Amino acid sequence: EFITVRADSVSGNHEIKALITVKPDTPPESRRPYTIRNIYLHDDHTLEQTTTDTIAYGKYYLISQRRSLRFETLQRGMFLKPGQRYARTDYMHTVRYMNELPIVRHTNIKFAPYGNTDSLDVILYLSQRKRYAYSAEFNAIFRSTNYFGPGMIFSYTDRNKNKGAELLKVNLRGRFEVQLVDGEVNPAYEMGLEVNYQLPRFYPSFLLNIGQRSLPKTSLTAGYNLFNRLDLYRLNSLYTNFGYRWSKNDRVQHTFNPIEVIFTQIPEASKSDEFNQYLQENPGVQRSFDEQFIVGTSY
């Protein structure tokens, strides 16, 4: 509100010259460059907050009721630092980083000038989500192979597993379906378990030196899936992947998985005579049902 921009396009060549000036009526306090003095961190601020505990870490002050977030987690995302000049880009990066933490619902930052000096205190207010979440999802499946049936997914989420905004998510899924062909009923069911653990930083940190402004995350996923065609075979699948995610802006996101492992197997004891005969008559199909162990990398 205190800056004007004048654009001059007379020069042509599809170019514009921009002249940025500060308005004459800008108050002195808005012209003054401020240096950050102290930083006050409220890790879970609520209107009903009564008693708090304040812990000093140099010029950082953690103000908390339950100490639900470790100081290192908050400091890692504070780009406004004591002794440095205030910059709006640091403010925007701080808000973006804090809002990306799974436990954080809302971020608010206030500034308090210190007396008549050019020093500024920064006050960070975080409001948290509920740490634990449970959900159930029900669906129905209709396949082109005439299989149909109900399915369900139960999810458990911990948004602050070790007080460092780590995300733990567990999915338990199941499905039952039948196939109707010429009056015959062919049943099948599927069960699966998937566990995902996510850190709001790179681990180990020395592998990728990208910086906290890119919202780094480390993810580890492992899962097991069982598919049982009761009249034909039983398919077991194990998979795991370890990788990193980061994004310098809201439009571009990078995902790099240096380790991806998939193992599938059909136990011989689960194969019916009818299924074995079908595989012998169709060698091309048989290869798709062979035991597979796949290791890869993706970006």
Model-found features: residue ranges?
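Short glycine/serine/proline-enriched coil/turn segments at secondary-structure junctions
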Residues: S11-G12, Y114-T117, S144-N146, N162-G164, ...
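Conserved structured core elements
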Residues: S68, R85-M92, L101, N146-P150, ...
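Periplasmic polypeptide-binding modules associated with outer-membrane biogenesis and secretion
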Residues: E1-F142, R173-V178, E184, I210
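Secondary-structure transition/capping motifs at alpha-helix termini
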Residues: L101-R105, L126-Y132, D158-L167, P204, ...
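Extended beta-strand-rich architecture
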Residues: V122-I123, E137-S155, S237, V295-Y299
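Outer-membrane beta-barrel translocator/receptor signature
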Residues: A133-S135, S144-Y197, R201-L207, K217
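Outer-membrane beta-barrel pore domains and translocons
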Residues: K23, H42, A112-Y114, S127, ...
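Transmembrane beta-strand segments of outer-membrane beta-barrel domains in Gram-negative
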Residues: G12, G77-F79, A133, E184-Y299
